[in-house]
A protein has these predicted regions:
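Solvent-exposed beta-strand/loop surfaces, strongest in extracytoplasmic domains of secreted
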Residues: 1-290
């Protein structure tokens, strides 16, 4: 008689396992069969050691059948084994996403994605957006997101996490990525600088001409010897915006500075000199002179 022992450790889906068969005569022919655990024995099917690699995750029974030889009777032995689900992701798995400028989000161009090998069985991936690298604080309306964890709209650095559901042969997995929403470069329109000296303080102001609908601003101006947006005397000035009051917009040095002028006021003179008699002292009356 032949006393057989078969060893097949559990293995992960896609890996090549090794069958260890002990006790078989050296000149015997061995055939391996398998079935799903607890299925009827009539479901046994032939399989090779290489074929085990293609089995889906699950629990099975392996049967080793040793055919009869000249000196030994045939024999068989069974052993249960498990094919574990594989992990398609790890701590280095990344989400691909292209950042954008505030106000220019494109649902297709800026949509997150993952490599196909991270989702080999094409599960529906859920993407959630966060404000921190640890992905613990979801985006909110403060970031311009319509829902918690939704796509942010406001300028800043954000993170996105892909959650890949468990499938037939793969464990659930995650991947992360980071991107930036850059501030929108502001373009300024200034109030008229066609100003003339009138003895009073006069000023110029700016507004953002490429603002998105609904956006508000509180502009601040620099005031020192070099820059001012308020003047009284007739001369040339430079105004400079130093803050827009809206973090979703940026302002270049070139765009922030504006040259303006208070022109000299025209003088309209009137002189009155009545006729007078020789030897008399006339009086000249000059009107309109500063």
């Amino acid at each position: 008689p032949v006393t057989l022992t078969v060893v097949l450790d559990e293995f992960t889906y896609g890996e090549q396992p090794v069958i260890k068969l002990q006790g078989a005569p050296s000149d015997s022919k061995v055939v391996y069969q398998y079935k799903v655990k607890d299925k009827d024995d009539s479901t046994y099917a032939d399989i090779t050691e290489e074929g085990l690699k293609k089995l889906s995750a699950g629990e099975y029974t392996l049967k080793a059948v040793v055919e009869e030889t000249a000196n030994y009777v045939g024999a068989s032995v069974t052993r249960g084994f498990k094919v574990k689900k594989a992990g398609a992701t790890d701590s280095h798995s990344k989400v691909d996403i292209e950042g954008w400028t505030y106000g220019s989000y494109d649902g297709k161009k800026n949509a997150p994605s993952i490599a196909s090998d991270l989702n080999p069985e094409n599960q529906t991936v859920q993407y959630t957006y966060y404000t921190d690298g640890a992905c613990t604080t979801q985006t909110s309306t403060e970031n311009g997101a319509e829902t918690a964890g939704g796509v942010p709209k406001n300028a800043g650095t954000y993170y996105v996490k892909a959650q890949i559901p468990e499938s037939a042969n793969y464990e659930a997995g995650t991947a992360t990525g980071t991107f930036e929403i850059k501030p929108r470069p502001a373009q300024l329109d200034w109030s008229s600088s066609d100003l003339t000296y009138n003895g009073k303080d006069q000023r110029v102001t700016a507004e953002v001409r490429n603002a998105l609908s609904g956006d508000g601003f509180t502009l601040a101006y620099e005031t020192n010897e070099a820059y001012t947006n308020t003047g009284k005397n007739a001369q040339k000035y430079k105004a400079k915006v130093i803050d827009l009051g809206n973090a979703n917009y940026s302002l270049s040095e070139e765009e922030s500075v504006y040259s303006w002028e208070i022109k000299k006021a025209p003088v309209t003179l009137t002189v009155v000199l009545d006729e007078f008699t020789y030897g008399e002292q006339p009086v000249i009356k000059l009107q309109g002179a500063p």
